[in-house]
Amino acid sequence: MNPNPQSTSSNFHQTELDKFAALANRWWDADGPQKPLHALNPVRLDYVAARVALPGARVLDVGCGGGLLSEAMARLGAQVTAIDLAPELVKVARLHSLESSVQVDYRVQSVEDLAAEQPGSFDAVTCMEMLEHVPDPLAIIRACASLLKPGGTLFLSTLNRTPAAFALAVVGAEYIARLLPKGTHHYKDFIKPSELAAWLRTAELQLQDVSGMLYEPWRNRARLSSRTEVNYLACAVKP
């Protein structure tokens, strides 16, 4: 796959784009390689909807993949723009949107480029399961902050850099239970909540909440939790 010609950003690993692009055709298969993501999606949606009135809100989904969260927010009435650097994923997202008749503005574009074009345009920005896959997470957060209107909210989810996260998200999920393709995650790129909080302060955002997100593979269900050792969600507001 060639780098996206529409983007001037270099804030991506081509191997990461290729890895997820290879999953494009089964992105919406609830029993496929993205099975855990399908289980996490209702939790992510509820977390956002509890903090932002989605009907009529302008929302940007950064690193949208095949559009699971994008479509879910649009179904609740949000005006969703969704971006990703993998053309294969955006194509799948657009096709599914046509099948479901849920309107989402999907684009192959970097968040940095969009921030240069449309600063201060969105009531909320979501960036889920993406920061641990890019070379410069702070640059992503800065761009997201720029895109928010004053009073807008940034929603993030990622993986904590702990022994528990390594054991469960890497060894357990990829090599033992085989819930995810091998190589999906790299432990060194996981992000501690304290690191995320520091980046949010640097981007002049005010951290509002950090909540754990627990995935139960034996039930294929996920829920919010007070434990942040593995997956966690965070939200921050632009003053």
Curated annotation (Swiss-Prot):
SUPFAM superfamilies: S-adenosyl-L-methionine-dependent methyltransferases. It catalyses: a 3-demethylubiquinol + S-adenosyl-L-methionine = a ubiquinol + S-adenosyl-L-homocysteine + H(+); a 3-(all-trans-polyprenyl)benzene-1,2-diol + S-adenosyl-L-methionine = a 2-methoxy-6-(all-trans-polyprenyl)phenol + S-adenosyl-L-homocysteine + H(+). PANTHER family: METHYLTRANSFERASE (PTHR43464), UBIQUINONE BIOSYNTHESIS O-METHYLTRANSFERASE, MITOCHONDRIAL (PTHR43464:SF19). S-adenosyl-L-methionine binds at R44, G63, D84, M128. The keyword Methyltransferase applies. It comes from the Bacteria. O-methyltransferase that catalyzes the 2 O-methylation steps in the ubiquinone biosynthetic pathway. Belongs to the methyltransferase superfamily. UbiG/COQ3 family. It is an enzyme of class 2 (transferase). GO terms for biological process: methylation. Pathway: Cofactor biosynthesis; ubiquinone biosynthesis. This is Ubiquinone biosynthesis O-methyltransferase. GO terms for molecular function: 2-polyprenyl-6-hydroxyphenol methylase activity; 3-demethylubiquinol 3-O-methyltransferase activity; methyltransferase activity; polyprenyldihydroxybenzoate methyltransferase activity. Its EC number is 2.1.1.222, 2.1.1.64. InterPro entries: SAM-dependent_MTases_sf, UbiG_MeTrfase. Transmembrane segments: none annotated. NCBIfam families: UbiG. Keywords: Methyltransferase, S-adenosyl-L-methionine, Transferase, Ubiquinone biosynthesis.
